[in-house]
């Protein structure tokens, strides 16, 4: 895992193919492990990609007497911070995906072919992925990029996270403008994305009291959220919380919540 644009790019098919091979929890060393320090642009893009990996770790054994750390590029510290905070906000969604992986083997970072086997175009797409089931990610992986081409799989609509949830039909390639702050994401039609509030800064001692739900309604769809204390094995004796959200789209969008388990935190 060398600090290079090639490594950044090919980490995507490496991780998604390991997911297809029964290894759902994977991640690459952010910024590269061995070699010289990454450039500022490369490191920012690597963090923006790494926040979607099951294993997010910034560490290195550089051969130029540097140590890769989030604060090494002060000019981009806000971009790095914002990306990491976004990962924290995704904690409820990610933890539920981890639970699903433990039960079914479904990867956290999914190759598009995992969910869209009837779309022949996704068999040629190696550099996009699904984060969990419902978020398509097309990270910026080319140096100096000003635009990013994105293929949206056929069979459903997609909503652009960064463009006021602009709706696109699936089965087409679009080209979007990007800046250094861009983390291109598209929400799958029918999704319910649970996010923590902006105050969650660490998973040790911090607890979110509010969930923000992003809903892309389609017909009647069921989504499951899972939570427990994240530390003990008490979940084996029922100390967990599994919440089922049933969303029905019509003239109005209705949401029904049912839950099981005794975890209350």
How would you name each of these model-derived features?
Residues 182-265:
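Accessory, solvent-exposed terminal regions and/or long lumenal/extracellular loops of proteins
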Residues 1-182, 187-188:
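Catalytic-domain carbohydrate-binding cleft regions of carbohydrate-active enzymes
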């Amino acid at each position: 895992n060398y600090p290079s644009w090639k490594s950044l790019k090919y980490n995507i098919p490496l991780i998604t193919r390991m997911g297809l091979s029964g290894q759902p929890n994977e991640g690459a060393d952010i910024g590269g492990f061995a070699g010289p320090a990454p450039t500022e642009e490369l490191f920012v893009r690597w963090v923006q990609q790494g926040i979607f990996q099951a294993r997010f770790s910034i560490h290195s054994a550089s051969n130029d007497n540097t140590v890769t750390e989030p604060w090494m590029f002060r000019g981009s510290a806000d971009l790095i911070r914002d990306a990491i905070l976004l990962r924290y906000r995704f904690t409820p969604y990610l933890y539920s995906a981890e639970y699903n992986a433990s039960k079914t083997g479904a990867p956290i970072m999914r190759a598009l072919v995992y969910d869209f086997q009837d779309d022949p175009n996704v068999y040629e797409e190696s550099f996009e992925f699904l984060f969990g089931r419902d978020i398509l990610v097309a990270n910026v992986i080319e140096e100096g990029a000003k635009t990013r081409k994105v293929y949206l799989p056929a069979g459903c609509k997609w909503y652009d996270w960064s463009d006021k949830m602009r709706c696109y039909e699936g089965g087409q390639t679009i080209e979007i403008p990007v800046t250094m702050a861009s983390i291109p994401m598209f929400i799958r039609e029918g999704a319910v994305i649970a996010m923590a509030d902006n105050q969650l800064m660490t998973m040790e001692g911090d607890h979110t009291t509010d969930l923000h739900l992003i809903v892309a309604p389609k017909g009647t769809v069921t989504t499951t959220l899972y939570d427990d204390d994240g530390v003990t094995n008490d979940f084996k004796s029922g100390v967990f919380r599994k919440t089922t959200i049933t969303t029905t789209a019509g003239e109005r969008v209705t949401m029904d919540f049912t839950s099981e388990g005794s975890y209350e935190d």
